[in-house]
Design a protein with these regions (language model features):
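N-terminal cap/lid segment of alpha/beta-hydrolase-fold proteins
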Residues: 28-44
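Conserved hydrolase catalytic core segment
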Residues: 123-166
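Flexible "cap/lid" loop of the alpha/beta hydrolase fold
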Residues: 151-188
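Active-site loop/oxyanion-hole signature of alpha/beta-hydrolase fold enzymes
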Residues: 89-132
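Alpha/beta-hydrolase
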Residues: 183-230
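Conserved HGGG/HGGXW glycine-rich cap/lid loop of the alpha/beta-hydrolase fold
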Residues: 42-97
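Bacterial N-terminal signal peptides that target proteins for export
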Residues: 2-12
Length: 230
């Protein structure tokens, strides 16, 4: 009888351990739609969770640096399948504004992503980067690869020198007046002049977003990017 009782005890204990182990190995806890802030070095970053789908979350990294997550509202419909996590990197959008050059280091941007991941308890997730966000995604993966199921590189930017060489080639195909405005603005470091802004708009209309920008009913944020950081 003692042997039988002990066997039952061990079986019960074993079952309990298995349950605990499975609970400990569970994937990311179910995220709820909403927004909040996470404290990081230099201030707080704003984030928003779109949707409460059951599949693996998607974490979005916007471009810039100095851009915002505003355009990511176009991905809101994906929230029916999985939580879509957007946030504004420190210094722009709804996150703490700053012009502190000591904070403009890649490692600080990487730690912002890690702080958000930790705060939300993400165990597994997909990482999406756009433009500068692709470089940030790569840098983040090199330091914190655990939990990343895949990375999506959208309009990738991995090298400033290569990007500039490509841009210079494209600029030569634009009208002379546009080329002159760009050359003058960059020579004088005057990126706010009407001529330069117009030339920049022409460049992106030709080589960036060629179609009418998509809109979202959620796209109501008036938070702006940070030109100083950019």
């Amino acid at each position: 009888m003692y042997h039988i009782n002990n066997t039952k005890r061990y079986a019960t204990l074993f079952a309990f351990i298995i349950i605990v182990l499975f609970a400990g190995c569970r994937s990311t806890p179910q995220l709820k739609a909403g927004e909040g802030y996470v404290t990081v070095k230099g201030g707080k970053i704003w984030y928003r969770i779109l949707g409460e789908g059951k599949q693996t979350p998607l974490l979005m990294l916007h471009g810039g640096p100095g851009g915002t997550s505003k355009s990511f509202y176009q991905f809101a419909s994906l929230g029916e399948d999985r939580p879509v996590i957007i946030f504004d990197q420190l210094g722009s959008g709804r996150s703490g504004y700053h012009t502190d050059t000591t904070l403009l280091k890649v490692e600080n941007f990487v730690e912002q992503v890690e702080a958000l991941k930790t705060s939300l308890g993400l165990k597994e997730f997909y990482l999406h980067g756009h433009s500068w966000g692709t470089a940030l995604a790569l840098e983040y993966y090199l330091k914190y690869p655990k939990g990343i199921k895949a990375i999506i590189f959208n309009s990738p930017y991995f090298s400033t020198s290569l990007w500039k060489a490509d841009a210079d080639t494209l600029i030569t195909t634009l009208p002379d007046s546009i080329q002159l405005a760009i050359k003058t603005g960059e020579k004088n470091h005057d990126y706010g002049s009407p001529a330069y802004k117009n030339a920049n708009e022409v460049f992106y209309k030709n080589f960036g977003v060629r179609k009418t920008k998509l809109t979202s009913e959620l796209d109501t944020s008036t938070a702006k990017g940070n030109e100083f950081i950019y």
